[in-house]
Amino acid sequence: VNMVDRVEVMRGGGSALFGSSAIAGTVNIITKEPATNSASLSHSTTSIGGTSALDNITMLNASLVTDDHKMGIAVFGQNRQRDGYDANGDGYTELPTINSQNIGTRMFLKTGTYSRITGEYHHLQEYRRGGDSLSIPPHEANIAEEVTHSINTGSVKFDYFAPNEKHRLSIFGSIQHIDRESYYGAGKNPNAYGGTTDLTWVAGAQYNYKFDKCIFMPAEFIAGVEFN
């Protein structure tokens, strides 16, 4: 969340303007855009339930912007190591162990006074393990839930604004690849392993025009096309 600027929630059929499949609503996570030259590094350690189980989180943020503000880049990274937590001492975790790394970047380039290109890339690598006997393979434990995710996401967008601010054209594309390996089983079942690989891409364009007066009131016309 250290790169999140705001979260926009839109309910109802009007959300289809943001995507052809968004018929019930959308949740848009808007990431921060680089505005100044800055860098920060932080680390926190939390004891879970006052025990020796620790949650360690290290975060890095940095941004660089040219003097004329025509180009900028922001990068972030997070490393999290959380121990499994057994609240009642029965040998089974209530909170799984977590080992995750998250990195990403957002950059922009102003190609003209009224146009710009924005690009983003995010990578998430996460391992979770819950149950008992966390130090041995999951199929040797009595109960085990183990999931490993590797997610890569990238997007690029071109925006053009007319000098009179009435016309706007956006051309966009994004792609995401997910690799997931899991184990959900009990009784030392060796056949409870699973795996999933998925590739998703979206590309499209959107045109907006603002009417100062349409019949008797201001209005906005929106048209677009999307492929996935």
Give the location of each predicted region:
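Transmembrane beta-barrel domains of outer membrane proteins
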Residues: 10, 30, 61-65, 76, ...
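Membrane-embedded beta-strand positions of outer-membrane beta-barrel proteins
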Residues: 39-43, 73-77, 105-107, 119-121, ...
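Flexible loop and strand-edge segments within Gram-negative outer membrane beta-barrel domains
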Residues: 82-102, 108-110, 114-169, 176-198
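N-terminal periplasmic accessory domains that precede
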Residues: 1, 9, 21-44, 56-61
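Short loop/turn motifs that connect adjacent beta-strands in outer-membrane beta-barrel proteins
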Residues: 34-38, 66-71, 113-116, 161-168, ...
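Transmembrane beta-strands of outer-membrane beta-barrel pores
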Residues: 45-49, 66-68, 79-83, 123-127, ...
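Hydrophobic, lipid-facing positions within transmembrane beta-strands of outer-membrane proteins
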Residues: 25, 39, 56-60, 71, ...
